[in-house]
Amino acid sequence: MKVEIDSFSGAKIYPGRGTLFVRGDSKVFRFHSSKSASLFHQRKNPRRIAWTVLYRRHHKKGITEEVAKKRSRKTVKAQRAVVGASLELIKERRSLKPEIRKAKRDEKAKADKEKKKADKAARKADKAKSAATQASKISKQQAKGAFQKVAATSR
């Protein structure tokens, strides 16, 4: 025996009972009574109508035994080494005091600044040297030379 479920109220529909409504998009709705069909056609929300199964579920009615809450597994952070830094190095850096950390950071920034400055000076000197060796710039057209007329060789 196939027992259907009411599309609106969620009630059971036994064989030989209820009506079918087929919408324009060919979706089939089954209704237990004209009452639920009427409310469906009025576009009422079954969660707001007190006697429907959806309302009872939504408002937690009729649940006798309290179901124990599902326990979610807590994620535990695990320290792992990263490429280029071992676990000991990471732990050591984490345990540094903020003042020491700031001093190290400033020192590194200063060293980077000096390196950048030296690099820029070297690049500038290199550019000046290359500019001195290249006396006059020649365009690509000049480098190719004047157009050479091909002599006829047929005679």
Swiss-Prot record:
PANTHER family: 60S RIBOSOMAL PROTEIN L24 (PTHR10792), RIBOSOMAL PROTEIN L24 (PTHR10792:SF1). Pfam families: Ribosomal_L24e. The lineage of its organism: Eukaryota, Fungi, Dikarya, Ascomycota, Saccharomycotina. One of its GO terms (cellular component) is cytosolic large ribosomal subunit. PROSITE patterns: RIBOSOMAL_L24E. Residues 97-129 have a biased composition (Basic and acidic residues). GO terms for biological process: cytoplasmic translation. The keyword Aminoacyl-tRNA synthetase does not apply. This is Large ribosomal subunit protein eL24. The keyword Ribosomal protein applies. It comes from Eremothecium gossypii (strain ATCC 10895 / CBS 109.51 / FGSC 9923 / NRRL Y-1056). The gene is RPL24. One of its GO terms (molecular function) is mRNA binding. Residues 133-142 have a biased composition (Polar residues).
